[in-house]
């Protein structure tokens, strides 16, 4: 593999044995691609805005004299960029402008004669835009729209598993689910009649819907039944014989062939052998006794030719009397329905008998009564309702997916068709459910991923937009029908509010629009790749059973079987597998390598769950020879959802990668294959809760996906184009672009501005640090700057800690963790948390609130950190209770005496009518002010601090833009100099020419002269562009802010809190091994090895066997080896050994392992590159051991040997307190530990006195309310059991809800009198009141 300059800085040793056939696809593509499809112009009109507009427009007036037509749309540019929107608390959105055409028709002239056409561009609201990282900024906060897994539109057949009826009989049902519109259900009842339901309403006989579709009884019988024809003879009947139909029946007469030989005796069951005999004799007719027809069902109406009387009606049972009547009337042939209890039941016949309707109108009225109970039906209303239900494109849409699924399920060849139902569709569904009931077909598996599809952000936004458009359509249609249209323009007809409201509601408060989990880069990526079965149109937690939540065979390679939340949402919220993607229909598909005659090719096909069932698919771990041929005779594979073994020649596809089945979070766990699945689930989930540490540290033992994840998450800065680094500082990186990658006529400079110390959604700190130096060569995709939790472009969620598995004085009992003081001293787990505190000055009824330093009854010391505007200084160190923003609120006016009025007039004394409502630092918070933002309403005068901040921002913007302009101009001037040197100028001449004159020189060479003129134009454009950018920036900074109604000013203060690790904090490894820190132990007391190196953390060995997460032990061994090799390299560097020896050792490391695919050509590295690599490997050689394809035990031992460590991975440790050796060797090594966002500082809380509940007068609960600890029923029992009567009395009265008692006790304590008089608890009074509210008079007798 070829490594770029920056990749050579540190190379991860990879133990993967399988070649990478397919790179991991861009991890955020599910979000970005979906939204791109929504916003991009689509000429076909199948999706996005275009589809929504075309489905609603043209809007015609009721009279038909006018219509509003859609022409085109365009999305404008956003007013603010993403960062500005976050600071200002506004939505990152762009205005949608639509060109509409209003056409007026001439009433008097011929139909369709146009009288007038008006075209106009109309504003239709703001549409939130997606950022480059797949998020939305809504009201200043980053949100993610989670994709939804819902039931695909189409037709589904199912049964009730025998649960509906007490007999346990299985009742089948069918359901047609459209994308938009009413559901249509067919279901059998216990008596085997078929019923229909529309929108889950009251059920009707299924034949009613057929009658409504204009089928007569005769038509219905012809559709669903074959016929048996009889010729009427004098004493017998002759039946047309179809031999197959007799199978399973008991012969009620002797069955003879044409010669009269008895083939089946009377009373015998007719078997397949009898059928074969009958077929051999070519018997086509069979004479049967007259009694045979009794009870058969007539296939049509039989009418007396003379009188016109119906002798036997269709679907009636035929009796012997009926047969005599038919014979008398001269009818020679009759046909009956072919019904067989075994495989051809009389379901439709039975249904027709319970159907009270006889014609179409009656059926329509019956449907109308069911849908609109209580309304009087008319013919037109009933017809309109029925047509609108399933046959109107406005009200009903199966969608392309639904039609494809519908047609495939019913074996209709064409995958395309209309979005509405046809008569044939409904009949086909009924035939299919009858076939299932007869045993010829099977029900569907609704949990199969072929029956569930993904609805991503673009599709959901489009649906919401269409909802808004439909609301507008109603209003437009009414306006078109009213008033004089000659004066109106399209703008006057359209009100954009309903559209904006629908879109805003979706992005702001939909269940699937979630506050982005921004703990670390992994949590961001997994949130964007989350797939939820909940949400509108999905399941609910309460109704979801085990089957829906369970892992299904079709999840393979599509949804991760590991990563899902623990708790009520388990199985309902899933994560996309690493290589999965959605196809055009929204079904998940996963890639497979094609196998031809047992040889694996590099051709990759993406298969959906439906297609996958048709093929035989082998796993990625199959043994292949050098030509790609499968070596084993029998190969483990999957076919039709089952695991089996087949020969190599039968295999059609093979997995692309062993990591294919798991998600990104799960694939970050090394040695995942050695962990129990439940613990792996916890490990995957806990990595998302890791807080970014102050100093990121790459994992020594990783899986090789760390770099991909860090780059795709967008938290690092990756190079857009190749070149070399021209300038670096803490906030900006400038890259000079390679000539080959330039577009003609551009400056050739890429500027990357870095994000500094901003707050994330979870209050963690987002900060980017450059990781390149001036002069470094760069290729596209190289990491230029690290973000939070990244180290040289690798994801780094935690720290590598030296671990010992041993008990230590009970401090690691029950998963507790003992850590060394050194860990805290070195700030290994120190994290920065940034809190945003807001102070809002409102306009109240009594007057405006004011932000000021002049606060009543506050001492000088409390104001020491405020400036004259009453706002805290940046850099001030504050603690709980300190004032951050001084604010006074007007109090209600009190009646003043004339003397007071006079004094007030003279001295301007205002203190008495305002109260202090300043913003203070919350209790238990201590930190540093790092930023202050002031937002002032348009038209309100800005205070001094706001003006200062404004000026500072303008100066900063000017400085940034000037530097940017300077860099770009230098690029242009540099290219001009090169051009002039090429044209014959020498350095001395150029030095004499002023910089401004370089671009206006004349050259003899015409081509070069043209190039120089182009550069001069470019420089002019840059200058104009700079002025324009600066003016826009200045205007944005100085303009007033659009604040909520009644808000005059908002001050936002950002407070940075540094948190070191301490007892009570939660830590975890990556294998689900979590625990709470019990003690921080002095370094000298920690166990140490024979070389005197103490361990950092002591874990309990009992945490491993019962949890079956052995991966952590292997990680510790491999970590020890990786660190040991790093120590050997450090020694070599310190001892200044020969470079050849260092190169040889590093080469040994990278070449270690059997069948390892990674090839690192260390010999091709220059000496400088070897030294730089060695310096970066001092802390340990990073290892990649991919999931299901990782390092083997033998390789771990080889690594330990190379590091000079015992192959057992165990060392003799010495007790730091006694100096004695522990009696056994201890497993010591390096494990990657995470500090989780469950910090004791956020949970620690104590109450003295505080707020009380209004009704019960008991203290509130929870830290947020400054509440108390609940003393519940069981705690009362405990005190009763101890006989602690006085303590109990205290708990139930003065410490809880005895209002007078607690007030008195407070006074007594102040006075130094430690006595109490308990009174009546308020909750007893509440109980009395509640009993009285039931109408029971209850009096308390206090005698």
UniProtKB/Swiss-Prot annotation:
GO terms for molecular function: DNA binding; DNA-directed RNA polymerase activity; ribonucleoside binding. Its EC number is 2.7.7.6. It is an enzyme of class 2 (transferase). It catalyses: RNA(n) + a ribonucleoside 5'-triphosphate = RNA(n+1) + diphosphate. GO terms for biological process: DNA-templated transcription. Keywords: DNA-directed RNA polymerase, Nucleotidyltransferase, Transcription, Transferase. It comes from the Bacteria. GO terms for cellular component: DNA-directed RNA polymerase complex. CDD domains: RNA_pol_B_RPB2 (cd00653). Transmembrane segments: none annotated. InterPro entries: DNA-dir_RNA_pol_bsu_ext_1_sf, DNA-dir_RNA_pol_bsu_external_1, DNA-dir_RNA_pol_su2, DNA-dir_RNAP_su2_dom, DNA-dir_RNAP_su2_hyb_sf, RNA_pol_bsu_bac, RNA_pol_bsu_CS, RNA_pol_bsu_protrusion. Disulfide bonds: none annotated. PROSITE patterns: RNA_POL_BETA. Belongs to the RNA polymerase beta chain family. HAMAP family: RNApol_bact_RpoB (MF_01321). DNA-dependent RNA polymerase catalyzes the transcription of DNA into RNA using the four ribonucleoside triphosphates as substrates. The RNAP catalytic core consists of 2 alpha, 1 beta, 1 beta' and 1 omega subunit. When a sigma factor is associated with the core the holoenzyme is formed, which can initiate transcription. PANTHER family: DNA-DIRECTED RNA POLYMERASE I SUBUNIT 2. This is DNA-directed RNA polymerase subunit beta.
